[in-house]
């Protein structure tokens, strides 16, 4: 949790780590890509070479934690770190004619201690040359860095990189890779939100979570006028190595990433998380416990959406539980899943610092057969917006043993809306509150005599209006308790229907209640499936307290 909190805070500041065992794997050649800042010796490079590097690296022992940074970097505050700026005149593709993209590097420092090596590649000749660290690549401003401590440290490396797109070259980045294997992108709002990672290991097991690192990147030199670039990455950790290829399309309204990886297990792994996503949910329309602020909602994402291999669409609203929760949803060759931020109305957030209404959704589309496995969702209790408390990933069914090799291909869409939608009625919003009284009498002259919790789920789209005269039937399944006072209400402002029911406990258990609902008309499903997890209070809290003073 400490690592996740650090990455969250550090990336937020950066938005306004030494490589083990790869040096001996490089071969040297003759000439490299056209980049003024690339100063290393030339070496042959392509994706097959990177796969061989990762394969061979997995046969060697992991060399452990990164070496200490110079004191002037290790003791930096976030404010000081954020004041270091890369010199835009020395950007990676500064000399490319009619460039639409450009790349800059993040400085080492603060908690970013893992050395990341950078290489420029000429895609025509497949020759690469390393870009070594040197202080003149940066403007230190008032960061207070003693640059004398950095002299001669060409092997210091970088912390990560970010990419800019015209007309905002050197001003507003659209892609960022920084910290462990974390990376992010934006849509046309230029507002960062949730993150992705290269890999997750033992996120929810009895072992300590492992955070693999991207330890080196190779950049194909972009073509003049191009808005697509390709970057390759070497991933390394105690348990696994990997070769990654990212083909990143920086479009007008979204960023699309085609990802291909080849993974090589060093040792047995209890839980391997493929294509992990990391987000934040503090409070929303369904979960008000932590919303005692001026903001009605605080979240990077509001739901997990899943398009299962059998064609079923599922909407799972996110929670901020009082106790850590992990749920695994079984599937076979999923068609897609993602953490979505579909509510884009500023008035629902009232936040001029976080701008949560502008944050992108992230949708994943497998590009090869993933087989059997589960979509894992972990929800961590949080008191606020500074901790990423939502983690989602694909876990293959097959246990991972030392020496195993895997290959996954997938596409990531960073956009306001996912590229595909359920053709049936979709969940627009989930709300919860006091139950046990007739709608329109909230709660009347006195509190209800019997405690209950009300759930209201709004559905829009599909064939709802055509189905209404024939009869819409909510199909509700509960793991415990009873659903009563079920109502179907037409909501004119959204041109949709609200399904409302009260949940009544049938025991004193405080175990999470799994709820499932979809809409049916004449035997056919006419909506996506709504999944929810409710956490009932202790039995002595299931009462309404009238604290009014009438005299």
UniProtKB/Swiss-Prot annotation:
Post-translational modifications reported in the UniProt record: Predicted to be exported by the Tat system. The position of the signal peptide cleavage has not been experimentally proven.
Pathway as given in its UniProt record: Glycan metabolism; osmoregulated periplasmic glucan (OPG) biosynthesis
Signal peptide coordinates: 1-32
Protein origin, superkingdom: Bacteria
Main location: periplasm
Signal found in the keyword field: yes
An annotated GO BP: beta-glucan biosynthetic process
GO molecular function, one term: carbohydrate binding
Compartment list: Periplasm
InterPro entries linked to this entry: Gal_mutarotase_sf_dom, GH-type_carb-bd, Glucan_biosyn_MdoD, Glucan_biosyn_MdoG/MdoD, Glucan_biosyn_MdoG_C, Ig-like_fold, Ig_E-set, TAT_signal
Keyword annotations: Periplasm, Signal
GO CC annotation terms, alphabetical: outer membrane-bounded periplasmic space
Entry similarity comment: Belongs to the OpgD/OpgG family.
Role noted for this protein: Probably involved in the control of the structural glucose backbone of osmoregulated periplasmic glucans (OPGs).
Protein name per Swiss-Prot or TrEMBL: Glucans biosynthesis protein D
Source taxonomy: Bacteria, Pseudomonadati, Pseudomonadota, Gammaproteobacteria, Enterobacterales
């Amino acid at each position: 949790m400490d690592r996740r909190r650090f990455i969250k805070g550090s990336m937020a500041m950066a938005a306004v780590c030494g490589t083990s065992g790869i040096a001996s794997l490089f071969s040297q050649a003759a000439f490299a890509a056209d980049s003024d800042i690339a100063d290393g010796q030339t070496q042959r490079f392509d994706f097959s070479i990177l796969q061989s590097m990762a394969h061979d690296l997995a046969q060697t022992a992991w060399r452990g934690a990164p070496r200490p940074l110079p004191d002037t970097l290790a003791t930096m505050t976030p404010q000081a770190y954020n004041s270091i700026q890369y010199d835009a005149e020395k950007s990676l593709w500064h000399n490319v004619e009619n460039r639409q993209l450009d790349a800059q590097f993040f400085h080492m420092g603060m908690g970013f201690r893992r050395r990341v090596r950078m290489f420029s590649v000429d895609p025509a000749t497949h020759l690469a040359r390393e870009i070594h660290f040197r202080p003149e690549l940066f403007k230190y401003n008032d960061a207070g860095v003693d640059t004398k401590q950095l002299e001669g440290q060409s092997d210091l490396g970088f912390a990560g990189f970010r990419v800019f797109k015209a007309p905002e070259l050197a001003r507003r980045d659209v892609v960022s890779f920084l910290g462990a294997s974390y990376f992010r992108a934006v849509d046309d709002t230029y507002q960062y939100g949730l993150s992705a990672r290269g890999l997750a290991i033992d996120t929810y097991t009895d072992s300590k979570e492992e955070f693999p690192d991207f330890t080196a990147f190779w950049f194909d030199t972009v073509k003049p006028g191009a808005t697509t670039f390709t970057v390759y990455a070497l991933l390394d950790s105690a348990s696994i190595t990997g070769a990654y290829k990212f083909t990143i399309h920086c479009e007008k309204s979204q960023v699309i990433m085609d990802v291909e990886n080849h993974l090589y297990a060093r040792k047995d792994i209890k839980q391997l998380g493929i294509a992990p996503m990391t987000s934040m949910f503090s409070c929303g329309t369904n979960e008000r416990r932590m919303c005692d602020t001026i903001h009605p909602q605080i979240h990077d994402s509001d739901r997990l959406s899943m398009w299962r291999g059998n064609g079923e669409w599922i909407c799972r609203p996110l929670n901020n539980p009082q106790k850590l929760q992990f749920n695994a949803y079984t599937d076979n060759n999923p068609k897609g899943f993602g953490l979505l931020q579909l509510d884009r109305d500023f008035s629902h957030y009232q936040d001029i610092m976080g701008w949560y209404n502008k944050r992108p959704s992230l949708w994943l589309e497998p590009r090869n057969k993933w087989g059997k496995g589960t979509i894992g969702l972990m929800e961590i209790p949080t008191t606020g917006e500074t901790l990423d408390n939502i983690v989602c990933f694909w876990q293959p069914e097959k246990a991972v043993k030392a020496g195993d090799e895997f290959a996954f291909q997938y596409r990531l869409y960073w956009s306001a809306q996912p590229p595909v939608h359920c053709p049936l009625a979709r969940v627009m919003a989930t709300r919860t509150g006091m139950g046990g009284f007739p709608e329109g009498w909230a709660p009347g002259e006195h509190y209800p005599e019997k405690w209950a919790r009300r759930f209201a789920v709004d559905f829009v789209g599909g064939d709802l209006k055509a189905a209404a005269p024939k009869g819409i039937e909510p199909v509700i399944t509960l793991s415990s308790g009873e659903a009563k006072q079920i109502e179907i209400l037409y909501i004119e402002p959204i041109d949709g229907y609200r399904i409302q029911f009260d949940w009544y406990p049938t025991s004193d258990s405080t175990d999470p209640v799994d709820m499932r609902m979809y809409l049916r008309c004449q035997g056919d499903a006419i909506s996506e499936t709504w999944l929810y997890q409710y956490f009932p209070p202790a039995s002595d809290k299931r009462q309404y307290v009238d604290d009014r003073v009438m005299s």
